[in-house]
């Protein structure tokens, strides 16, 4: 049996041993390109529910017209990315501008365009060419676009793997373990990603019952 097969078996066994691990489907994504870009570029290294989610909600409320990429980019340039995103530190505002510019160059205007574009094999390398976007954010953009065949490996998923006695040597290995475990559990990789993320987030915050994560 390969090392990966052993790791997948260990992960599935760990999940089956958790009485409070409840499979939950991801919620519907944003129908607003500004929200998608903001969500993806702000989420790294901060608490999603208390930091990112309120800022995305505020952006949708204050900039309802930014449902297309070009209008969102116009707002970023006219009002300033720091004001639009509600974020004034670090490179995240610049990353949001660069991502919007890439999508415009790729003729991605609407959420429908984005959902189609993100599935092209050439799209991920282009995303990774933007400063501030790594493998996790590139995959997270895929999840925001509704892809179900991947997982975005963050600190919560890595910690869950360690709890199962697994120490992946790379992002790609961790992702492969999650994807194979999802097959064993007969759920999509995106659903398993979402469920682990919420389970670990709630456990850290002391919440008893996991729910859904956007």
Q: PLM features: residue spans?
A:
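C-terminal accessory module of base-excision DNA glycosylases/AP lyases that mediates lesion recognition
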Residues: 1-31, 35, 92-97, 108-111, ...
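Structure-specific DNA junction-binding interface
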Residues: 1-86
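Alpha-helical ds-nucleic-acid-binding substructure associated with the helix-hairpin-helix region
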Residues: 58-130
């Amino acid at each position: 049996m390969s090392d990966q097969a052993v790791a997948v078996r260990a992960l599935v066994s760990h999940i089956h041993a958790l009485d409070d691990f409840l499979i939950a489907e991801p919620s519907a994504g944003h129908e607003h390109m500004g929200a998608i870009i903001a969500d993806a570029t702000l989420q790294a290294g901060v608490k999603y529910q208390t930091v990112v989610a309120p800022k995305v909600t505020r952006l949708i409320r204050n900039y309802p017209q930014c449902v297309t990429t070009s209008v969102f980019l116009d707002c970023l340039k006219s009002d300033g990315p720091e004001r639009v995103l509600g974020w004034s530190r670090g490179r995240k505002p610049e990353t949001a501008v660069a991502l919007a510019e890439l999508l415009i160059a790729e003729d991605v205007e609407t959420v429908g365009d984005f959902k189609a574009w993100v599935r092209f094999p050439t799209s991920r390398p282009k995303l990774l060419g933007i400063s501030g976007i790594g493998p996790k954010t590139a995959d997270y953009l895929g999840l925001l676009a509704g892809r179900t065949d991947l997982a975005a490996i963050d600190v919560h998923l890595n910690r869950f793997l360690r709890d199962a006695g697994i120490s992946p040597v790379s992002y790609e290995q961790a992702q492969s373990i999650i994807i194979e475990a999802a097959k064993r559990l007969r759920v999509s990789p995106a659903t398993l990603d979402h469920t682990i993320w919420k389970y670990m987030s709630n456990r850290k915050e002391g919440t008893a019952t996991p729910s859904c994560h956007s």
